[in-house]
From Swiss-Prot:
GO terms for cellular component: membrane. One of its GO terms (molecular function) is aminopeptidase activity. It is an enzyme of class 3 (hydrolase). It comes from Brevibacillus brevis (strain 47 / JCM 6285 / NBRC 100599). This is Proline iminopeptidase. The active site is at residues 102, 241, 268.
Length: 292
């Protein structure tokens, strides 16, 4: 499969991209999570979709192979929306499908609602977070299912502002192995991409852990605007996902042309936990969207 890589100038620096495949079908652009993670885990699964269309992966500014500026004012949703527009323009992506995962769904929603771009044929919200407050409420409920001592550790360190302690990190792992990735051992592509992630971006925009939003995304809520998304839409999540099936179904109910799929043996990274089914569901949705 043909692959093209390069850099694109965006507000704040250069971002690295990889274009896989050259089929005639509409390109798919993939927005990774974090904020501050990398494209690698998603590409390890979704590159196979390049057999009949170009699939574009990129590392958002600050992470992976992209420039890592230290200016904290760059880490805001509006700039990431501009970045996505720049990438589409640079690669001449007049028509696209978009797949966003986790934070990538926040970016996708902001892009669709605020930038009102032309040429987006469909949108896939993978393990979505479209209301930070709702995410926090879900996380609080999931934490209540952890061992009592783990719950107490989380509460104590968040109250005392000592979330960088080893105790808090260990408690985080208990939550993550239930609701982020249930595979044991953790897939190599996840462990190897960690050093390329950017904790500063994550802390500035989100917070010290998945269940403690304290950054500038803590007030993020696009649920009132979801009805404006009037293109074929797919919402997917795992049965044990921190992006819970209940909340994912709620978001789906607010979007006019939306469907829902739950991966029964997955948490937050269904694309790694149930790879074959994930690819099958995405492929089927894209074909359906293109047949309309």
């Amino acid at each position: 499969m043909r692959m093209q890589e390069g850099y694109i100038e965006v507000p704040g620096g250069r971002v690295w991209y990889s274009r896989v495949g050259e089929g005639e079908k509409t390109p798919l652009i993939v927005l990774h999570g974090g904020p501050g993670n990398t494209h690698d885990p998603l590409k390890s699964t979704l590159h196979v979709l390049g057999d009949d269309r170009p699939v574009i992966f990129y590392d958002q500014l600050g992470s992976g192979n992209s420039d890592r500026p230290t200016d904290l004012t760059l880490w805001k949703t509006e700039r990431f929306v501009e970045e996505l527009a720049c990438i589409r323009q640079a690669l001449d992506l007049k028509e696209v499908h978009i797949l966003g995962h986790s934070w990538g769904t926040m970016l996708a929603a902001a892009y669709l609602v605020d930038a009102k771009p032309e040429g987006v044929q469909s949108i896939i919200f993978s393990s979505p977070c479209l209301s930070a407050e709702r995410w926090k409420q879900d996380a609080d409920r999931l934490i209540e299912q952890l061992p009592v001592d783990t719950q107490q550790t989380i509460a104590t360190h968040e109250e005392q502002g000592t979330t960088d302690s080893q105790e808090y990190q260990d408690a985080m792992k208990e939550y993550y192995k239930r609701h982020v990735c249930r595979l044991d051992p953790m897939p190599t592509v996840m462990t190897e991409s960690r050093p390329k992630a950017n904790k500063e971006v994550y802390m500035t925009m989100w917070g010290p852990s998945e269940f403690c939003p304290t950054g500038n995304l803590k007030t993020f809520d696009y649920t009132p605007q979801l009805h404006q998304i009037n293109i074929p839409s797919l919402f997917v999540c795992g049965r044990y996902d921190e992006a819970t099936p209940e909340s994912t179904g709620y978001y789906q109910s607010l979007v006019p042309k939306a469907e829902l799929h739950v991966f029964e043996n997955s948490s937050h990274v269904g694309y790694l936990e149930e790879t074959d089914e994930y690819v099958q569901v995405i492929r089927r949705f894209l074909q359906k969207a293109e047949s309309k």
